[in-house]
């Protein structure tokens, strides 16, 4: 979720550079990502807090009920404490980051 918030803040800076239509498309894309992930927040105890060791591997969390598959999601700062989220959530965030990176290449 931190990544989405930081990304959203970056869009404010991009607004002046981008045309209105492009900015609105980008804003809608991020809002859709956030809305899709709202119901996925769950308490999860990391097995380790070393994200450089885990490298988004499964399993990074204890899930007694074996209900979900998890991935480490320290994608902003490798030294940040490891948080674990559902695999689907992490993959959606990575897809969003890739979209933004490609958009940056088109602009620059």
Swiss-Prot record:
Residue span of motif Processing quadruplet motif: 39-42
Keyword terms, alphabetized: Amidation, Disulfide bond, Knottin, Secreted, Signal, Toxin
Primary location: secreted
Residues with Isoleucine amide modification: 107
Gene Ontology molecular function: any one: toxin activity
Assigned protein family: Belongs to the neurotoxin 19 (CSTX) family. 11 (latartoxin) subfamily.
Free-text comment about domains: The presence of a 'disulfide through disulfide knot' structurally defines this protein as a knottin.
Stated role: Insect toxin.
Protein name as it appears in the record: Latartoxin-2c
Natural source organism: Lachesana tarabaevi
